[in-house]
Amino acid sequence: MGELLTKQPLVEALCELRFSPSDQWDTALPKRFYAEVKDEFPECTELNPVFQVAVGGQPVDMSEPNKALSRLQLRNKDNSVVVQIGADLLVVHHLQPYTNWENFRDLILRMGSKYVELIGEVKLERVGLRYINHISPPEGRFEIEQFLSVFPILPSPLNLDLAGFSQVYEFQYVQPKAVLKHQTGIVQRGDGKVVLLLDLDFISQGIESIESSNKIFDLSSWFQNWLNQAHDCVEAAFISSLNPDYYESLR
């Protein structure tokens, strides 16, 4: 997050940009994008074809041949950054080692600028900044409240040892206009280890400031401000979601 913790529970940070369907899109654009960034992202993988669904759940007219597309997944040399590009979509993932917010933000801006440079005028329909954390509890029995400040409180006779739990809350923000999807739970990783999940996804969509004025996507001002505000909100939610003693142990 903003403060670089000595012990980071972060496993992945990502920013997802979804744009309005554009006549400027063509199937050659992902490979043109790769050609521009291949020195930084030498590994390129074509993912299985994706059938797009428009915002609002309305299916895209599949008679348009370029709407059922394979996405390109680009990786840097140490696999710490993954960029996905597809029709009206750009996703920037940052895995470990995660350095700091400023570097991640600048990476998002560079990749977004490259996308806009290649496709031309675009409108942003949805943007999300998401941080996924895995907290490793001790083996055996443990109390969730040792780690999280947001946890299930159950009355008797339900006050029993939990085999698992999942909680999802959605909080509305005014500035910027957004929803924070806050998820906690117990999950099992691919290696079989059980961890506590803290997943924070800050999402703005149907963005009035862009759609109502018919402006094109502006990376130089509005988007930079949105990223910084979104990160501040996610960081505050992260800190307040943790037991204060546990948070101190991470610093």
Across the structure, where does each feature detected by a protein language model lie?
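Short, highly charged C-terminal tails/helix-capping segments
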Residues: 55-58, 127-134, 239-251
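Aromatic- and glycine-enriched beta-alpha-beta binding-site module
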Residues: 83-132
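Conserved short hydrophobic interaction patches
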Residues: 36, 40, 107-118, 230-233, ...
